[in-house]
Design a protein with these regions (language model features):
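A preference for well-ordered globular domain cores
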Residues: 1-146
Length: 146
């Protein structure tokens, strides 16, 4: 009976039909650092998505600011600039309550949403730059959203 360490060895079927045991090379320190950087960048991207989806508050009213709200707000803003929206216009807030917004109130809400998006992306870019500049796995893992 053949035995092998399943954690590190793979069986490879060759062209002649024989099966050979193959142990992949041990990752280098550079490989491990690159993997840690990729993992930490993915964590930052996930945190960015969550942070960018938090409601924004305008005049004490919370509004959804997630990806769908961003699309809806952009579309309606473009339509309003083309004269296709009458004001006051209706918009649902984060509590699912209909708000009647003047053109200025609507513009302020859209501006708040995109200010949040800009802030979140700037933070994400800075953190990812720090990850790329880190020289040890410990330094990489110390870079967090909070």
């Amino acid at each position: 009976m053949n035995t092998f360490d399943e954690a590190t060895t793979r069986l490879i079927d060759s062209t002649d039909g024989d099966v050979y045991a193959h142990t992949p090379p041990t990752p280098t320190a550079a490989d491990e650092l690159a993997a840690a950087k990729a993992a930490q960048a993915a964590i930052i991207s996930a945190a960015r998505t969550v942070a960018g989806s938090q409601p924004v508050t305008v005049n004490k009213i919370p509004y959804d600011a997630g990806p769908q709200s961003q699309k809806n707000a952009s579309g309606k803003m473009v339509a309003s600039m083309a004269g296709q929206v009458t004001f006051p216009t209706q918009w649902r807030d984060a509590n699912n309550k209909t708000q009647s917004l003047s053109q200025i109130q609507f513009a302020n809400m859209v501006t708040a949403i995109y200010a949040q998006v800009e802030e979140v992306y700037e933070k994400s870019f800075a953190l990812k730059d720090a990850i790329e500049a880190a020289e040890t796995i410990e330094d990489v893992q110390a870079i967090n959203w909070s």
